């Protein structure tokens, strides 16, 4: 069965071009969430286990126990220990409402008017809608921030958390969001990106030993395990940075809806 959709002209980006683009992208995501708030739909073909962080952490612990002779066991085991210790510190995200969200809000799932300003700061639509499903909002927004706020991407051992991009995205989201967020739901927005980075680090670390799921770059790495270990360490690096930046991120989340977007002069050219 094929699904026919109207073609949307536009330009996609693999990395955020600056705070103004992040503000606009987050505003579009907020409008998407708000528009679907009253949707009553029986979803079929849902991806099981998506963002089931406890399951991913348990899987990592299991694979560390099962493959003690793997060539990468020692660094993966050290990372797994750090991940488990941090998970025990983070506030649990239990009991939050499941809202209809995109499910994969990375930047290249948003189309923009053009490649250059001001068009690159004018989002047209979200694409790749097969992941749309109910999910707690903090995990959706956390996944977006994980993707947008690390200009070094997923294939480097050391990440770089871009606080300006984060703050612009939060301001754009809050300005456009019309959802009636409960106090605990809004408070949990602070911790979504912490959990998501931890979860993805655990997933990459597990596959560094299993070498079964994620693809890998044969031009840069000798095998899948080495590539996935770099990815796992990169997400741990990003997690450490967003965890350390929690006070600053909390200030951004307390921002007043309707804040002016950042100047496009901050966009990378």
Task: Specify the residue positions occupied by each region the protein language model found.
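A conserved loop-to-beta-strand element in the N-lobe of protein kinase catalytic cores
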Residues: 1-5
């Amino acid at each position: 069965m094929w699904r026919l959709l109207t073609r949307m002209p536009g330009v996609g980006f693999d990395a955020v071009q600056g705070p103004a683009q992040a503000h606009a992208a987050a505003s579009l995501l907020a409008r998407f969430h708000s528009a679907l708030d009253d949707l009553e739909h029986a979803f079929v073909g849902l991806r099981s286990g998506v963002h089931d962080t406890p399951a991913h952490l348990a899987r990592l612990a299991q694979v560390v126990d099962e493959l003690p002779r793997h060539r990468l066991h020692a660094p993966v085991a050290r990372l797994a220990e750090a991940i488990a210790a941090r998970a025990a510190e983070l506030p649990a995200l239990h009991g939050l409402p499941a809202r209809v969200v995109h499910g994969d809000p990375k930047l290249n799932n948003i189309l923009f008017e053009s490649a250059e300003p001001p068009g690159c700061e004018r989002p047209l639509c979200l694409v790749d809608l097969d992941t749309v499903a109910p999910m707690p909002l903090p995990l959706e927004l956390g996944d977006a921030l994980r993707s947008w706020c690390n200009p070094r991407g997923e294939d480097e051992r050391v990440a770089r958390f871009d606080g300006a991009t984060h703050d612009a995205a939060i301001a754009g989201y809050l300005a456009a969001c019309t959802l009636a967020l409960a106090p605990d739901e809004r408070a949990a927005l602070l911790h979504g990106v912490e959990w998501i980075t931890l979860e993805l680090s655990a997933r990459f670390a597990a596959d560094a030993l299993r070498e079964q799921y994620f693809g890998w770059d044969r031009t840069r790495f000798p095998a899948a395990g080495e590539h996935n270990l770099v990815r796992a360490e990169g997400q741990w690096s990003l997690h450490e940075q967003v965890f350390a930046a929690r006070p600053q991120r909390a200030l951004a989340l307390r921002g007043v809806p309707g804040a002016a977007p950042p100047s496009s002069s901050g966009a990378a050219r």
